[in-house]
């Protein structure tokens, strides 16, 4: 049995303990979940952070993007996931159009926190710093999502790797420092070159979570449906199907946690170059 599965003696994961994991060099394993049953399974398997992502628009609702996801959708799924978790930290996305001003972000975050979230995730860099600071000053833990931000898919002209080239890399570093200075307790980086993600991770004092950002981040996240190989859409380069060769979902999630913790995932084949 994996050493990460000591559920009876496992302490609840908190924002503070995530910082401690980073300091100790223990990688953080995060997965998305959208209901109580899968959330409980992930907790049994040693997942540190469960994310109610707006990816539910793609994998649950069948949408082409995350843009149609509403705050009511996130609140509902957060309530469901909260019923299945007691030890993993529960993070929820604020969906598109719900944090245009600091005040709107606060009211959106309050609803999600009241539904059971312990941290909220917002997409944006330097421009988002005043909003992040506004939330943190009001005791709402925040994770900033930089790099490829799916809510900006149309502004990017599609799902494209970010941070390539000197100017883009410098901007991403500036984004990371700005959101940290604003009080973000975690930074998620998506679809950026692995070397750049490593540089940002060493630059920051808070944990970094990667998805398509190489192996040097403080932790990793995948969408549950992707890592189980059940999503019929395009499989991104950074995804590994952990169901391959296994017969149960529990075993696949445990394999994911183990691979993240021991540093065997992601490999070079899951990472982007500059």
UniProtKB/Swiss-Prot annotation:
This is 3-methyl-2-oxobutanoate hydroxymethyltransferase. GO terms for biological process: pantothenate biosynthetic process. 3-methyl-2-oxobutanoate binds at residues 54-55, 93, 121. Signal peptide: none annotated. Belongs to the PanB family. It is found in: Cytoplasm. It catalyses: 3-methyl-2-oxobutanoate + (6R)-5,10-methylene-5,6,7,8-tetrahydrofolate + H2O = 2-dehydropantoate + (6S)-5,6,7,8-tetrahydrofolate. Its main location: cytoplasm. Catalyzes the reversible reaction in which hydroxymethyl group from 5,10-methylenetetrahydrofolate is transferred onto alpha-ketoisovalerate to form ketopantoate. It comes from Ralstonia nicotianae (strain ATCC BAA-1114 / GMI1000) (Ralstonia solanacearum).
